[in-house]
Amino acid sequence: MNILLVGCNGQVGWELQRALAPLGKLTACDFDSPEPRRADFSKPESLRALVDAIQPQVIVNAAAHTAVDKAESEPDLARALNATAPGVLAEAARARGALLVHYSTDYVFDGSGQAPRTEDAPTGPLSVYGQTKLEGEQAIAASGCAHLILRTSWVYAARGGNFARTMLRLAAERDALQVIHDQVGAPTGADLLADVTAHAIRAVRERPELQGLYHCVAAGETSWYDYARFVIEWARAQGRPIRVAPEAIAPIATAAYPTPARRPLNSRLDTHRLQAAFGLRLPHWQQGVERMLREILS
């Protein structure tokens, strides 16, 4: 199997390099790769030449404009990366008869209510990021290519910056913390996403009827506030230097912390379709976060 991975240096892309390697010949590309492997998503049409050069049976797109607040001030760039480029890759995949794997987000929903969203639930993005990611989904579906779209949320990895690292740093520096309590979701490891992707690619190649849209997040749910407390208390139990006392971590509402982009309060995603289709049991979010903490604190 010839696999083209674009966006290989991001959190998910880095883990995909590991997870996809056993499946076949893997060509991993990013915006700073040397020619002819350069994946310039700001010039989406150049991606056709990349696909023609590699001639893959599977294209995995892990590239995106994920700076949610920044997207509000640069919507054209966000649209090029999140909507136009996936559409070009989809057309190239259809022309070659290749499978396109793409990642989307809970931000395509408006975050109302408390029930987990299914794949068929009405969308209603609140931000430029969410809108452009939805447009990317729509472009892929409209292309008619074989595709696998995985919506996810609250993605983290041991490599690079993440929420847990930030909380640990602040907890060691400050006497008090305020953390948002009314946004709820499931922290999902990039390693879990990559492993599910590899499993799903094998399955879809054998059973094409499994292609389509799925939700992929870790099991369980938490708020950013409870997530922060879990991280800090775990580190304290391991003897790490934590300055802030448990009672000095205060919950605050999203409304008290305004940002350029609106965030969905309800980021719960229903994963029953994914688990049933591919015979999976997704682990609880605490398992993945604890594993990540052991890695970054070792």
Features from the language model and the residues they span:
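N-terminal Rossmann NAD(P)H-binding glycine-rich loop of SDR-like oxidoreductase domains
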Residues: 1-22
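Rossmann-fold cofactor-recognition segment
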Residues: 30-45
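NAD(P)H-binding glycine-rich loop region in Rossmannoid oxidoreductase-like domains
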Residues: 41-81
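NAD(P)-cofactor binding segment of oxidoreductase domains
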Residues: 59, 73-101
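Catalytic helix-loop patch of NAD(P)-dependent Rossmann-fold dehydrogenases
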Residues: 80, 85-88, 108-150, 154-155
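NAD(P)-dependent short-chain dehydrogenase/reductase
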Residues: 141-199
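Mid/C-terminal beta-alpha module of Rossmann-like enzyme folds, strongest
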Residues: 196-197, 203-258
